[in-house]
Amino acid sequence: MAAQTLLELQPSNQSQLSALNTTSCDNAREAWDLLYQVLPIFILTICAFGLLGNLFVLSVFLLLRRRLTVAEIYLVNLAASDLVFVLGLPFWAQNIWNQFNWPFGDLLCRVVNGVIKANLFISIFLMVAISQDRYCVLVHPMASRRRRRRRRARATCMVIWAVGALLSTPTFLLRSVSAVQDLNISACILLLPHQAWHVARIVELNVLGFLLPLAAIIFFNGHILASLRGQGEVSQTRIGGPKDCKTTVLILTLVAAFLVCWAPYHCFAFLEFLFQVRAVRGCFWEDFIDLGLQLANFFAFTNSCLNPVIYVFVGRLFRTKVWELYQQCTPRRPAPLSSSRRKEILRRFWRN
């Protein structure tokens, strides 16, 4: 392949990485030169907005002096996952700026890529959990009152974080900084020990990390939309009124934004697998997949800074919480004294 994807630098030997310069498919050289200069700036911009936005969201949820609801527990974990994710983006921005010459050492090569990979799984699993929670509230409201517990939501989030860390373990173990003599660089690459690992990787990435969660998300949200459309105002009365509907609109928007941002990456990752097993060939496909992966990665990264924007512009209850936090943090002025009360205080003062 002529270049590597940000999340999965894929070559299993140096000859593949050397194809960056030696491949006969050199039609996209100008596009790559432009990408090396422009993409790092965009990634750093996403990092800045994602860092500030997710810190703001976490502050609003965690600083209010009241317990989180079940839905808010999931949203806090989603914001925390996005925050951890954007902390790794400056390393990748510098890596692209250096044309994949990794300057940060072997440990950060493993850690940064492991964190990014874990976030991919944690985010979509949280989307499934959030969708399932809304499904219970809207479609099975009576049962949800007995089953929805904060303790269960926290336990679910802990399991999701653990599974995400487990699925990112191969990335942490197989990533390393290797010298590429032809290019005179040291690249952070994924060294797969056997060709069969390519199949295992695509099953993990596309099936476990997208298709199965996508099926669950479509199932839950399809029933949610059908319930809202079929019950109308009656559903609001049964499930607790407009508050639940506002939360549902926010969550449906978050889910839709996540799928739109991440679907292109998974499509191009599958095309990359087809190219590796020679199911598709030719310079057109090579350039199309390589450039598409880079742009799809950038598009996926935007989701981490898009969620806080959705909270502000779509989440009415979130804006209410922002106002509550402002009032909580703003010192209250004492109420003005009436004239009779003022005279009574002065009389007691002079009497003493």
From Swiss-Prot:
Membrane-spanning intervals of the chain: 42-62, 73-93, 111-131, 154-174, 207-227, 251-271, 295-315
Gene3D superfamilies, alphabetized: Rhodopsin 7-helix transmembrane proteins (1.20.1070.10)
Sites where a glycan is attached: 13, 21, 184
One Pfam family recorded for the sequence: 7tm_1
GO molecular function: bradykinin receptor activity; C-C chemokine binding; C-C chemokine receptor activity
GO biological process: calcium-mediated signaling; cell chemotaxis; immune response; inflammatory response; positive regulation of cytosolic calcium ion concentration; response to mechanical stimulus
Top-level taxon: Eukaryota
Annotated membrane topology: Multi-pass membrane protein
Lipid-conjugated positions (S-palmitoyl cysteine): 329
Extracellular topological domain residue ranges: 1-41, 94-110, 175-206, 272-294
Keyword terms: Cell membrane, Disulfide bond, G-protein coupled receptor, Glycoprotein, Lipoprotein, Membrane, Palmitate, Receptor, Transducer, Transmembrane, Transmembrane helix
GO cellular component, one term: external side of plasma membrane
Cytoplasmic side: 63-72, 132-153, 228-250, 316-326
Disulphides: 109-188
Protein location: Cell membrane
Similarity comment: Belongs to the G-protein coupled receptor 1 family. Bradykinin receptor subfamily. BDKRB1 sub-subfamily.
Function: This is a receptor for bradykinin. Could be a factor in chronic pain and inflammation.
PANTHER family to which the protein is assigned, alphabetical: B2 BRADYKININ RECEPTOR, CELL ADHESION MOLECULE
UniProt name for this protein: B1 bradykinin receptor
Organism: Tupaia minor
Organism phylogeny: Eukaryota, Metazoa, Chordata, Craniata, Vertebrata
Gene this protein is translated from: BDKRB1
